[in-house]
């Protein structure tokens, strides 16, 4: 334990290339909530982000992610390159063992100060892999020779074979994700007693967490984009997702796919919606077996908040924006605005008791659309319990 009897906290940042923007949103939320780590460990892009976080460079990290594009990280062919030029580029990539990451090296050189990182009160560690024999190297700042921190950060992020291996003092190093994409064990070795882990579901090997330490896992329900496609719009979206997912993981939001308020009014509305949804299901199930198809759609969506699960699954299918803060009521309103009313109204006879076998069969063939219809009915049909919208 730390001197004030609070556990030593560690932030563990996984690798995942361009998805790393998500971790900036996580950092913003943790800072707002007053959760400060004494230790940060990272692999690949997680090590680059972790170094900036250890230096308290949130604005720098945010602005960097909001501005960089793929060509700012690696040498790419011109957008208007013809086929012969593309072939020449690919031959060069194969010959040189991956794409040139000089642009990334320039970014790291510009934003990271080794002396300041060594002076930070936050202890820092990273994982990289020796290319020969794929030997993992867990390194704390104390293990890294003076003047070599930026080299080892780039080594940790050398996503071979897409990117070139990083050579340091005659030894070639690869992305740490080849052996340990989520360095929880390193955090424990450095003295951690409580972990917050941020998973980007990147390529590589994520070892089981065998530390036995209290662990909060932060992971997006949503796809975060391609690992080698750096784009400001995607970064902006990922940061918002990371922010809300962290607040949810820490108990300040509810929902699974959407950031939903835990206020008393919102929770009352969620309970009211769940009751109305069950009543609609029950009424239809008494006449047709088609509600089973909606249940299947819910299982596929894998929503963990039982009261909100149907609304969240329907909202996702309708294309409701997940980067916005909602109450139950505003999420319901957003769904009703986005859903295709004309399409789901075709199921109305099933709710009114005048449906036929063909309509029931159509519901069975379109479980997601039928789930939307059930949710829409629950939200708009007036009953003897509090209305959600």
Segments from the language model and where they lie:
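Patatin-like phospholipase
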Residues: 1-43, 51-389
């Amino acid at each position: 334990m730390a001197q004030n009897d609070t556990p030593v906290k560690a932030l563990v940042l996984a690798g995942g290339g361009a998805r790393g923007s998500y971790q900036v949103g996580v950092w913003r939320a943790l800072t707002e909530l007053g959760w400060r780590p004494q230790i940060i460990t990272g692999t690949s892009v997680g090590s680059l982000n972790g170094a900036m976080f250890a230096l308290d460079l949130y604005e720098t990290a945010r602005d960097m992610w909001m501005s960089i594009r793929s060509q700012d990280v690696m040498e790419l062919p011109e957008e208007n390159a013809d086929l012969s030029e593309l072939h020449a580029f690919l031959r060069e990539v194969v010959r040189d063992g991956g794409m040139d990451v000089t642009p990334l090296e320039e970014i790291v050189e510009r934003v990271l100060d080794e002396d300041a990182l060594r002076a930070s009160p936050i202890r820092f560690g990273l994982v990289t892999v020796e290319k020969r024999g794929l030997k993992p190297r867990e390194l704390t700042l104390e293990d890294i020779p003076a003047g070599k921190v930026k080299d080892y950060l780039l080594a940790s992020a050398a996503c071979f074979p897409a990117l070139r291996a990083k050579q340091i003092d005659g030894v070639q190093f690869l992305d740490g994700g080849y052996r340990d994409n989520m360095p929880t064990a390193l955090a424990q070795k450095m003295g951690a007693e409580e972990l917050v882990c941020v998973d980007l579901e990147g390529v590589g090997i994520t070892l089981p967490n065998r530390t036995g330490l209290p662990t909060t896992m932060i992971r997006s329900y949503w796809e975060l984009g391609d690992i080698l496609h750096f784009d400001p719009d995607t970064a902006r979206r990922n940061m918002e997702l990371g922010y809300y997912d962290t607040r949810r993981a820490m108990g300040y939001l509810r929902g699974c796919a959407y950031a939903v308020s835990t206020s008393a009014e919102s929770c009352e509305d969620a309970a009211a919606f769940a009751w109305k949804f069950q009543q609609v299901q029950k009424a239809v199930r008494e006449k047709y077996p088609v509600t089973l198809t909606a249940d299947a759609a819910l299982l596929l969506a894998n929503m963990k908040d039982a009261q909100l699960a149907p609304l969240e699954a329907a909202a996702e299918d309708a294309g409701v924006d997940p980067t916005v803060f909602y109450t139950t009521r505003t999420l319901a309103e957003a769904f009703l605005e986005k859903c295709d009313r004309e399409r789901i109204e075709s199921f109305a006879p099933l709710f009114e008791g005048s449906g036929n076998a063909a309509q029931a069969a159509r519901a069975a063939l379109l479980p997601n659309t039928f789930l939307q219809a059930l949710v829409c009915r629950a939200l708009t049909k007036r009953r003897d319990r509090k209305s959600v919208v």
